[in-house]
């Protein structure tokens, strides 16, 4: 309904009603909202991603979704990213934008990709590249800590191609 009508206030109110941020189980309910909205946005068009982000960022800023729900809600989108990309080739780009917006809100740090993401995501071969795309979407140069995250996500194949996370970053920024 929100994608057609565009009433952000109503959408944020719906999120609050679904999550019930002051009640027991809010983190789990918030995670389900984040998961569903993220997968829907990943499979959508760029305009849908922007609409989802306007609701999500406002919901997080206003305390309608606990920040702990974000990482929990991204477990399946991260784990199944390679499968989602088969049907929705822009899914990785959309997910990078979504994660970058949460970094801008200071709702999380990039190191969650190393510490709190599904193992399959970290070992499937594209985790370092997603981290770079997140940093590119966020803008600015990556910090040493963020490059360390990329380095920790690099596979052996990545390391054969790039001697360091910095070189991998530079190669992708030039594209």
Predicted regions and their residues:
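Alpha-helical interaction scaffolds
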Residues: 1-175
